[in-house]
Amino acid sequence: MAAARPALPSSPTSLLLARSTSAPDLAARRPRRWLVAAAGVPAVAGALAASASTPAASMLLRDGGATLLVTAGAYSLVRAFDALTERRLVQQSLSRKVVHVLSGVFFMASWPLFSNSTSARFFAAVVPFLNCVRLLTYGLGFYSDEALVKSVTREGKREELLRGPLYYVIVLLIIVLVFWRDSPIGIVSLSMMSGGDGFADIVGRRFGSLKLPFNKKKSWVGSAAMFISGFLLSALMLSYFSWLGYIHVSWDQALGKLVLVALAATVVECIPVTDVVDDNISVPLATMLVAFLLFGNTAN
């Protein structure tokens, strides 16, 4: 007896209907897969948002943003005076010292942009570190930037980038890593180096006809400018960080101590040892020592 054959569709249309009812509907499955995958996106995004909202992540984002902002500001400051010097709108000697003053003040004033995290000082230290790399790169001749050389050097030689300017940013790096914004020692030392030493040269070159008897490269008026500007900038920056709550200042004692620190820094700046020890090293080191003896690690 012959085996029974399965019934066949009577027409092509019935064949298509049979296939559509018996085979899996792939077209319907694919959208479901995309919907499942898409449903996971909000969950991942929510997890990332939750992690970013934690205090540690928030501080990290703040410090990273502050680093980028301060780096861009410091670079723009130097490039602005590069352009002014290149166009001969500002004298090279004046540009060098104005950059000297403004760089230190700008960097110090930017410290409150960083968080209260213990790692914040390391983010801030990235700014002088990048400047160190930049000065080494151009000072060693790997790249050439005549505008930079003219704006921050005394004689317009690239080798000078490896002396005064490099010492300056190294001291900035040390101050931010060792002392930071909650120590009057670092604040006063940076104020004396940037403001005091900077204005001593600016005023001394313009009005310093009467020289010191023991150092003909320095003048009475330049030394007076060193003392006054260093004292005033130190007092201003201590007030600034005290107002923001980083340090406590008892002005009945602090003012007298600042006078002694400014006097010590001025005496060191006057000593004829520039050929041996650069002012950007001797002045902040002397200031750190005297400030440590007088203030300790507080501004009382």
UniProtKB/Swiss-Prot annotation:
It catalyses: phytol + CTP = phytyl phosphate + CDP + H(+). One of its GO terms (molecular function) is phytol kinase activity. This is Probable phytol kinase, chloroplastic. Keywords: Chloroplast, Kinase, Membrane, Plastid, Transferase, Transit peptide, Transmembrane, Transmembrane helix. Belongs to the polyprenol kinase family. Involved in the activation and reutilization of phytol from chlorophyll degradation in plant metabolism, including tocopherol biosynthesis. Catalyzes the conversion of phytol to phytol monophosphate (PMP). It is a multi-pass membrane protein. PANTHER family: DOLICHOL KINASE, PHYTOL KINASE 1, CHLOROPLASTIC. Its EC number is 2.7.1.182. Residues 1-36 form a transit peptide. One of its GO terms (cellular component) is chloroplast membrane. One of its GO terms (biological process) is vitamin E biosynthetic process. The chain crosses the membrane at residues 60-78, 98-118, 122-142, 168-188, 227-247, 254-274, 276-296. It is found in: Plastid, Chloroplast membrane. InterPro entries: Phytol/farnesol_kinase (IPR039606). Pathway: Cofactor biosynthesis; tocopherol biosynthesis. The keyword Signal does not apply. It is an enzyme of class 2 (transferase).
